[in-house]
Curated annotation (Swiss-Prot):
SMART domains: KOW, NGN. This is Transcription elongation factor Spt5. Belongs to the archaeal Spt5 family. GO terms for molecular function: translation elongation factor activity. Residues 98-128 form the KOW domain. One of its GO terms (biological process) is regulation of DNA-templated transcription.
Length: 151
C-alpha cells in the first residue's frame, strides 16, 4: 500500500521488550475474531511501540482490548511516510574521498583493497581501482559495500 485512504497506521504504546509478544497476541486475536488488521509492524529502532495497519479503528481497539502489556488505550495515528521512516534501515555512508584506500566488504570483489577514484553520493556509488597485484581493474560499486582502511 502506498499511503492509500483505505487503511491507516496506528501506533500502540506497549511495555518495552514485550513488542514481539504483543504483536503475536494481536495477530492471533485478529485471526480468531476476524478483525481487519492488515499488517503488524514491530519497528526495529524504536522500543515500546507496535504499529498496526487497519481500516477501522474499532478493529484496533478490539485487537488490543485487555492486553496486559498495552500501556495506552488510544493509539496514535501515523502517516505512511512516518511508518516508512521507522521501518527503512538507515545505511551509514562512509565519508570517502578520491585517493583513499578502502576495503570491499561485499559483492564480487569482497576482501580486496582498492583506491577510490570517484564518489557519486547522489547515486550511492563509488568508483574504485583494485589494488590486487594479479587483478588490476576499475569498478563502480555501491558505496555501502566499502569501508575505509586505516593506513
Amino acid at each position: 500500500m502506498e499511503g492509500g485512504v483505505d487503511a491507516r497506521f496506528y501506533a500502540i504504546l506497549v511495555t518495552s521488550g514485550a513488542e514481539v509478544n504483543v504483536a503475536t497476541i494481536i495477530a492471533e486475536r485478529a485471526r480468531a475474531l476476524g478483525l481487519d488488521i492488515r499488517s503488524i509492524i514491530v519497528p526495529p529502532r524504536i522500543k515500546g511501540y507496535v504499529i498496526l495497519e487497519a481500516h477501522d479503528p474499532g478493529d484496533v481497539y478490539d485487537a488490543t482490548r485487555g492486553l496486559r502489556h498495552v500501556k495506552r488505550r488510544r493509539p496514535l495515528i501515523l502517516k505512511f511516510e512516518e511508518v516508512m521512516k521507522l521501518v527503512k534501515p538507515e545505511v551509514e555512508i562512509p565519508a570517502l574521498k578520491p585517493g583513499q584506500v578502502v576495503e570491499i566488504v561485499a559483492g564480487a570483489f569482497k576482501g580486496m583493497k582498492a583506491r577510490v577514484i570517484d564518489v557519486n553520493q547522489s547515486k550511492g556509488q563509488v568508483t574504485v581501482s583494485l589494488l590486487e597485484p594479479l587483478f588490476r581493474a576499475t569498478a563502480t560499486i555501491p558505496i555501502d559495500e566499502v569501508r575505509p582502511v586505516e593506513e
